[in-house]
């Protein structure tokens, strides 16, 4: 259900007195000046917005290939909070971020001690989008959070125009390469569903995606034999 509201965030200016009768939701004072960011994807968005200096700490440093973030962690200007599945709570308490940005895990049952720190937890559910442009539009939410609204709107407008132009280029292509993707992990081979962002991306790029007719919006676990 793409119309269902999963969570509400109430953004109030840092210098603004809290108004009476705020809607129910997680209160976030903006602009966020010091965030703990779990995902390399969201670090990339903040890099595009020129807001790396707003990242006070990260998780899973080994997956973040952004030189400025690597350098800031090495010099101690940015906190490495360790593994996103089991972050270093003491480090997080010490630098006390304005907000914690993470990707929600399905049926996770919550985030343990993180939820008890009194710090706004922002669940970035962009991975649940079913189109590449839908996912990229999350940059506008980040713009609101970090005081970069104008830059975010401009960036999304440019990305959208470029993407649609590229989609038009492949509409008349008759020869479409067949595509499968991902790798076997454990006993299953997880492939993007036909209605997933990645599945749509392959199709928009002019590929004949093997699971294009599949109705799933997430990953599908298949056996090695099924894939081959």
Per-region residue spans from a language model:
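Short, glycine/acidic-rich beta->alpha junctions
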Residues: 27, 84, 106, 183, ...
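Extracytoplasmic substrate-binding proteins
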Residues: 28, 77, 94, 98-189, ...
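Hydrophobic/aromatic ligand-binding patch that stacks against planar heteroaromatic rings
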Residues: 45, 91, 113, 201, ...
């Amino acid at each position: 259900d793409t119309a269902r509201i999963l969570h509400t965030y109430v953004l109030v200016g840092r210098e603004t007195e809290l108004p009476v009768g705020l809607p129910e939701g997680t209160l976030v004072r903006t602009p966020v000046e010091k965030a703990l960011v779990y995902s390399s994807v969201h670090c990339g968005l903040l890099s595009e917005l020129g807001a790396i200096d707003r990242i006070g700490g990260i998780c899973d440093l080994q997956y973040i290939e952004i030189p400025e973030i690597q350098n800031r962690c090495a010099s101690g200007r940015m906190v490495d909070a360790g593994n996103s599945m089991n972050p270093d709570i003491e480090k997080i308490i010490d630098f006390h971020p304005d907000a914690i940005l993470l990707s929600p895990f399905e049926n996770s049952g919550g985030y343990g001690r993180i939820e008890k720190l009194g710090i706004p937890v922002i669940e970035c559910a962009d991975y649940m989008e079913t189109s590449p442009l839908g996912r990229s539009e999350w940059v506008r939410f980040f713009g609101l959070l970090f005081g970069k609204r104008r830059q975010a709107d401009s960036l999304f407008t440019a990305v959208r125009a470029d993407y649609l132009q590229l989609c038009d280029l492949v509409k008349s292509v008759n020869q479409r390469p067949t595509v499968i993707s991902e790798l076997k992990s454990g006993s299953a081979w997880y492939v993007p569903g036909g209605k997933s962002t990645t599945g749509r991306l392959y199709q928009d790029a002019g590929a004949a995606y093997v699971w294009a007719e599949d109705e799933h919006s997430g990953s599908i676990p298949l056996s090695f034999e099924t894939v081959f």
